[in-house]
């Protein structure tokens, strides 16, 4: 089986056997063997050898390859969406939007590169001051499973655009999406060695992160893994590390006029992608009193009607599955743990079929829980916390080690401005779902959600480093010599 793409060639793995499964049917989608350390090293060396020629290409030449990649994605959009749905359980309508995001990433990255890391110059005395940017060299990209096409693409595209070469290790749960993506790069004419693919689980990731031949690592995934990488890179300021991690995101609800609009926005924030977006609302802060009671009652009633089903089911469901049976069981266990601590199940999250990773939306009131776990429960489980006043709501919203996303539903601009100033998050939304983000904006958080290397529109910043130069075409003595020097 040809599993890994190294130096322009597909080759079989020499490590443990890997399988990706359809989360609903448990059918095998992809199978192969992981990369061992020697294969990881070969991928890094291939990238190192390809780097000088790729970096020396003109920016326009690299853009041409990237645009051909986008064109290939358009040609294979249906197959890519099918693969994303099959491997992640995401409904086809949502998988199709992910492919569209992959395509659009190319033009957005080019615009960002020109604005943030292009070339700038100006006169300075008898010289010209020039600012240019250089690629780091060889960078590793670790991809997640929830957006197996779009999120790795958000690192790979700007990295290649800047002139870097890449070794890509996707999630072991979504290897087929990665394989299809790499095939699109090959069809686009990307030179051998510029992008290398190594499939594998933890052992492959450890080998790649520890390889001395990489100049940087771009990671999207859990805070636990991100923290381990941060510790591993401690004392290595020469290597660039960009961490995009999760959040225990709060959504604060004020007493708004349009109750159903609030309910719909909450659902889009908490349960889209079966709650498997890093920006999903995990904590819903609702005012005490009759208005808050009415909101929660309406939310529960509507959530009972949310359709859950297989990725290709017709009519299309709103929610697909979570990524695996293991993930589904962990979420059911988390709900039970919250209930044991005093949480009240307002709408119990259930797993209708023991052999399918389909979960129904869950809502649990944890107001009375004294020691609420500050964890990211990555699925359709929403915790409700009732608050006495707006300041208490903001304090509770900030009561987390994370700082990725926060939102407010309110009819008052003054309240939003007050909330915005006091909230601690990299994404702060007003009357919009937490899971909505502008492609023309940076994406990242503070605290345990990242290391101040915002991605998306700001990915260009960590894909190249600035080089400042003073330049003049001819060497000449200045009109006035420095005191104490005689020529």
Curated annotation (Swiss-Prot):
At which positions is NAD(+) bound?
Answer: 221-226
Domain of life, source organism = Bacteria
What is the active site of this protein? 244, 278
Q: Which InterPro entries match?
A: Ald_DH/histidinol_DH (IPR016161), Ald_DH_C (IPR016163), Ald_DH_CS_CYS (IPR016160), Ald_DH_CS_GLU (IPR029510), Ald_DH_N (IPR016162), Aldehyde_DH_dom (IPR015590), SuccinylGlu_semiald_DH_AstD (IPR017649)
Q: One GO molecular-function annotation for this sequence? A: succinylglutamate-semialdehyde dehydrogenase activity
What is this enzyme's catalytic activity, as reactions? N-succinyl-L-glutamate 5-semialdehyde + NAD(+) + H2O = N-succinyl-L-glutamate + NADH + 2 H(+)
Q: What pathway is this protein said to act in by its record?
A: Amino-acid degradation; L-arginine degradation via AST pathway; L-glutamate and succinate from L-arginine: step 4/5
UniProt keyword list:
Arginine metabolism, NAD, Oxidoreductase
What Enzyme Commission number(s) does the record list for this chain?
A: 1.2.1.71
**What family, per the record?**
Belongs to the aldehyde dehydrogenase family. AstD subfamily.
What does it do?
A: Catalyzes the NAD-dependent reduction of succinylglutamate semialdehyde into succinylglutamate.
Put simply, this protein is called N-succinylglutamate 5-semialdehyde dehydrogenase
Query: What high-level taxonomic lineage is stated for the organism?
Result: Bacteria, Pseudomonadati, Pseudomonadota, Gammaproteobacteria, Pseudomonadales
């Amino acid at each position: 089986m040809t599993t890994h793409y190294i130096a322009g060639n597909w080759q079989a793995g020499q490590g443990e056997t890997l399988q990706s499964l359809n989360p609903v049917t448990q059918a095998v989608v992809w199978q192969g063997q992981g990369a061992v350390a020697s294969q990881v090293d070969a991928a890094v060396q291939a990238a190192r050898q390809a780097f000088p020629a790729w970096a020396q290409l003109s920016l326009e030449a690299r853009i041409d390859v990237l645009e051909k990649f986008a064109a290939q994605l358009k040609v294979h959009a249906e197959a890519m969406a099918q693969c994303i749905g099959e491997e992640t359980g995401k409904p086809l309508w949502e998988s199709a939007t992910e492919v569209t995001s992959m395509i659009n990433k190319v033009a957005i990255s080019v615009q960002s590169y020109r604005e943030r890391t292009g070339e700038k110059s100006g006169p300075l005395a008898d010289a010209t001051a020039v600012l240019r940017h250089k690629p780091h060299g060889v960078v590793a990209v670790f991809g997640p499973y929830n957006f197996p096409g779009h999120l790795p693409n958000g690192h790979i595209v700007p990295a290649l655009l800047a002139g870097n070469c890449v070794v890509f290790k996707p999630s072991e749960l979504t290897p087929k999406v990665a394989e299809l993506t790499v095939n699109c790069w090959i069809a686009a004419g990307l030179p051998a060695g510029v992008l290398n693919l190594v499939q594998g689980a933890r052992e492959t990731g450890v080998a790649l992160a520890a390889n001395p031949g990489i100049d940087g690592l771009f990671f999207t995934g859990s805070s636990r893994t991100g923290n381990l990488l941060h510790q591993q890179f401690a004392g290595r300021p020469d290597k660039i590390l960009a961490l995009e991690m999760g959040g225990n995101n709060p959504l604060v609800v004020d007493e708004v006029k349009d109750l159903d609009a609030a309910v719909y926005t909450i659902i889009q924030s908490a349960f889209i992608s079966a709650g498997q977006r890093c920006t999903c609302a995990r904590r819903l802060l609702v005012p005490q009193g009759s208005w808050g009671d009415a909101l929660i009652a309406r939310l529960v009633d509507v959530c009972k009607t949310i359709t859950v089903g297989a990725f290709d089911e017709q009519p299309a469901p709103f929610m697909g599955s979570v990524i695996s049976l293991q993930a589904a069981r962990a979420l059911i266990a988390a709900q039970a743990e919250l209930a044991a601590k005093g949480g009240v199940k307002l709408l119990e999250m259930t797993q209708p079929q023991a052999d399918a990773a389909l979960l129904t939306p869950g809502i649990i009131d944890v107001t009375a829980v004294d020691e609420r776990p500050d964890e990211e429960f990555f699925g359709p489980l929403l915790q409700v916390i009732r608050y006495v006043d707006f300041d208490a709501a903001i304090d509770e919203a900030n009561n987390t080690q994370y700082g990725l996303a926060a939102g407010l539903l309110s009819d008052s601009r003054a309240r939003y401005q007050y909330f915005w100033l006091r909230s601690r998050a990299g994404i702060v939304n007003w009357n919009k779902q937490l899971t909505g983000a502008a492609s023309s904006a940076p994406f990242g958080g503070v605290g345990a959600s990242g290391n101040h290397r915002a991605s998306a529109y700001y990915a260009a910043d960590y894909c190249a480093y600035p080089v400042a130069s003073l330049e003049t075409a001819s060497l000449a003595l200045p009109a006035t010599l420095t005191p104490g020097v005689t020529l």
